[in-house]
Amino acid sequence: LRAIANDNLIVQVSLDGGRPEDHDAYRGPGTWEKTVEGIKILQESGFRVRLGTTETPANSAHLEKLCEFHRSIGILDEDHFIRPLAKRGYSKEGIELGMGNLVPEITVNLDGIFWHPLSTDADMQVSKNFLPLAPAVERVKTQLEAMYQTGGVPLMTFT
């Protein structure tokens, strides 16, 4: 990992609580400790770490504790994002998401490129290939322009 660490590469990690019980309620028993250990390894390897937090009924009353925790391990407030629980994937609760209510935040994972990190399901996949990135960015721009012109979300197939 140290060989690829640099100022232009930020690794985002999901952390939903400053305490195991807040994070593990949705992520599974024992995942908080593994996640925090992974964050420390990334930091020691020279990576800038960004946290993505999903606000859930289990952690919503304890988000300030999470902020205190991430500051204590050297993660700045500007590198912490809190998003609402999305009714996507296996989640039976949360808000319904789609292109109409999500500002694009291009997300790359091993499955390809997606419109937003809250929506990495097939219907929000921009490209199955994560390289090169430029064609996917152009597709998102085209979709945004169409949404602006029509005032809605036209049916588009990205993949």
Residue ranges and their predicted role:
Residues I39, H70-G74, W115:
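Hydrophobic, Leu/Ile/Phe/Ala-enriched alpha-helical segments that form helix-helix packing faces
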Residues L85-T159:
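Accessory C-terminal segments flanking Radical SAM cores
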Residues H23-D24, H62-L63, K92-E93:
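Short, well-ordered secondary-structure micro-motifs
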Residues S14-G18, T54-T56, R83-R88, T120:
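Active-site beta-loop-alpha junctions enriched in small/polar residues
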Residues L1-A3, K65-C67, G94-I95:
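Short low-complexity, flexible loop/linker segments enriched in glycine and/or proline
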Residues A61-I82:
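Short, electropositive alpha-helical surface patch
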Residues L1-E55:
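Radical SAM/AdoMet-radical enzyme domain recognition
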Residues P20-D22, A58-A61, W115:
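Short catalytic/ligand-binding loop motif for oxyanion handling, primarily in non-cytosolic enzymes
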